[in-house]
Amino acid sequence: MARPTKKSGPRKQKRNVPSGVAHIQSTFNNTIVSIADPAGEVISWASAGSSGFKGAKKGTPFAAQTAAEAAARRAIDQGMRQLEVMVSGPGSGRETAIRALQSAGLEITLIRDVTPIPHNGCRPPKRRRV
């Protein structure tokens, strides 16, 4: 029986994108960093989970720092130099992720908090009793 031929998908080509937008979504359980070009095409992304952290460790500031460094490294390989940062969510990794992007060698031009705030929308979850 003949072996099925392997189909190779579209190869990711190296683009030269000097500026872009970083979206940091920081929840209590995880931090996701996506870096896109000005048109909105995602160039690189990383999360605390994809950086090797599991369980409760994904919500830590160190995990957010590691994820931001990984995403920044891939974006710099594509030619990224300047970033606008959009931060969303209440998590503990917000500031750490921004600092990690800066220390990776990216110049941050703008930081904007885009956390959605309800005008008395859904009922919040019940208080934890430990």
Curated annotation (Swiss-Prot):
Intrachain disulfide bonds: none
Biased composition (Basic residues): 1-15
GO biological process per UniProt: translation
GO cellular component: ribonucleoprotein complex; ribosome
Signal peptide: none
Any Pfam family matching the protein: Ribosomal_S11
Disordered as annotated region, ranges: 1-21
Keywords: Ribonucleoprotein, Ribosomal protein, RNA-binding, rRNA-binding
PANTHER family: 40S RIBOSOMAL PROTEIN S14/30S RIBOSOMAL PROTEIN S11
Record note on quaternary structure: Part of the 30S ribosomal subunit. Interacts with proteins S7 and S18. Binds to IF-3.
NCBIfam families documented for this protein: PRK05309.1, uS11_bact
Full protein name: Small ribosomal subunit protein uS11
